[in-house]
Amino acid sequence: MAAAALRAPTQVTVSPETHMDLTKGCVTFEDIAIYFSQDEWGLLDEAQRLLYLEVMLENFALVASLGCGHGTEDEETPSDQNVSVGVSQSKAGSSTQKTQSCEMCVPVLKDILHLADLPGQKPYLVGECTNHHQHQKHHSAKKSLKRDMDRASYVKCCLFCMSLKPFRKWEVGKDLPAMLRLLRSLVFPGGKKPGTITECGEDIRSQKSHYKSGECGKASRHKHTPVYHPRVYTGKKLYECSKCGKAFRGKYSLVQHQRVHTGERPWECNECGKFFSQTSHLNDHRRIHTGERPYECSECGKLFRQNSSLVDHQKIHTGARPYECSQCGKSFSQKATLVKHQRVHTGERPYKCGECGNSFSQSAILNQHRRIHTGAKPYECGQCGKSFSQKATLIKHQRVHTGERPYKCGDCGKSFSQSSILIQHRRIHTGARPYECGQCGKSFSQKSGLIQHQVVHTGERPYECNKCGNSFSQCSSLIHHQKCHNT
């Protein structure tokens, strides 16, 4: 039924604002395509590769729907307000001219779809599949010609159907796999893929290339196929951001970057309504709702939602600390931790509270501070029901129930439930007294000792007996006094 639907003529309406005059030179697929070298492709995780496939198919479909790209057939010149492009199935008796122009779409799609079949391997640039196409014609020209002509027709129909779909509503992982299967069935009928053993027993990928680039020597296997050396080899950045001057190899990368300046977040989570600037960020976020953790540490078996989190975690096992502070020489396993640390030296506090105006060096600290104003205590103890504003406070509290004392003194072996208590205890062994009185110069090992001492200078007596009304400067003195009433 799906195949029958694709054979039916499809009408595409293009608004005057988005349509480009075909007589003045269209933007071709190569103008907006993004290609990766083998090393670059190897750095992408699964979600990023899936995003790449989505973007390539989306761009190719949109270019094809405007009648641009590789010279699609049945083009009509634009009229007053709208342009209607009719696509119908090619007949066996179509002209050679149209067959060749339609046939150009097939190798491009083959390159894109090859990535779906070979994750993590070198992506094939345009020309790999074209050469395979030419090699097959060497054995059966007429049979191949008719098959490719019909195939290109179906691909075109499919692309026009794709152009009707609102691509901003695409859900990576849902719509895309179905579209890939549909395109693959049209481009690779019978499940056959390029780069396989052909009728003469020769592996196409082992053939030598004949058409080379004069700049870098990169070869193309079809004389009509451009070699994309500027973006892959020289590292030349073609698209520059007008706001900050940062340059990118692909136009789509620039569009993504510009959302940093515009604040645009077109991708919405249908679970919680949160918006994101990139589909890859949305995919990472969705795992919060699904609980999916597809990335596993081979050392300890710990699971992570994002590949980047796994990479950061693995530095615990390797001990790698590649990010060093230029001020004090301290090194960190994560760049984000270094950035936070550097604010100690710069004094930068970029996160400001809208209620009281206090500023903070980290967003997490600001979030904790805001709970003072809201009174929110989201962390509840499962044992006694007591709630806390910070997760760290809940963890400390839970040790009251469990009796856990994870902090051990290396000098005497005594253990403590909190690191701060261990730090105070160690001063017994070291003799450190970091808290000094500004009035008399007397120093103390604990801040509480200094506070108690300062009452001597101020004359303050905050501790009052509820029996006789006498007041005292220290709590211990009040407790000693109350024993008189008890006797």
UniProtKB/Swiss-Prot annotation:
Superkingdom as given in the UniProt entry: Eukaryota
GO molecular function: DNA-binding transcription factor activity, RNA polymerase II-specific; RNA polymerase II cis-regulatory region sequence-specific DNA binding; zinc ion binding
Cysteine pairings via disulfide bonds: none
Pfam families with a match to the protein in the record: KRAB (PF01352), zf-C2H2 (PF00096), zf-C2H2_15 (PF23561)
Bias (Polar residues): 79-94
InterPro entries noted in UniProt: Ikaros_C2H2-ZF (IPR050589), KRAB (IPR001909), KRAB_dom_sf (IPR036051), Znf-C2H2_ZIC1-5/GLI1-3-like (IPR056436), Znf_C2H2_sf (IPR036236), Znf_C2H2_type (IPR013087)
GO biological process: one example: regulation of transcription by RNA polymerase II
Renumbered residue ranges of the record's region Disordered: 71-94
PANTHER family (alphabetical): KLUMPFUSS, ISOFORM B-RELATED (PTHR24404:SF114), ZINC FINGER PROTEIN (PTHR24404)
Protein name: Zinc finger protein interacting with ribonucleoprotein K
Organism name: Homo sapiens (Human)
